[in-house]
Amino acid sequence: MVKGARLTKANMREGNNRFIGSSAMCNGLTALIANNEKLHPANTITVCYNGSVGETFYQDESFWASDDVNVLYPKFNMTKNIGLFIAPLIRYVGQRYAFIDKWRMDVMKKDCIKLPVDNNGCPDWSYMDSYMANVIKDSSDFLSNFMVV
């Protein structure tokens, strides 16, 4: 887990890099910037600990995280589907915190999320991946039905 870095609006340069702030909207994207000194890689999860406390998003492109955001780096092979599965679980735990409490890094490290496990008691990454693949397919099929008249 890594804390994001402060970047004031005055120091932002317009560009194509995502700037992830403490927002509950648009995957946390609050600006597109040219600044690239503190970019985090794709395939990570962002968690707001100030402002929109607990808002959690999977990031599929590199980005700059504001200083109100913590970035979670996986210690396992995290696919996009696994990231999309885990993000709402983290968000659920974060609901216990508010703007006044904040979800500081030291507190966040002590919190626990519950994951599905396999017969050996290890996280069932395969299940999480296939579950989200089905959710995405079902959602896509559902939306396609609205486009057919």
Predicted regions and their residues:
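A short beta-sheet element
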Residues: A31-A87
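Non-catalytic DNA-recognition/assembly elements of restriction-modification systems
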Residues: M1-M25, D118-V149
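Short, glycine-/Ser/Thr-/acidic-enriched flexible segments
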Residues: M25-C26, S52
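A generic structural motif
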Residues: K75-M78, V117-G121
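General detector of folded, globular domains
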Residues: F19, Y49, F57, V71, ...
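Intrinsically disordered, low-complexity regulatory regions enriched in Ser/Pro/Gly/Thr
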Residues: N11-M12, K38-L39, R104-D106
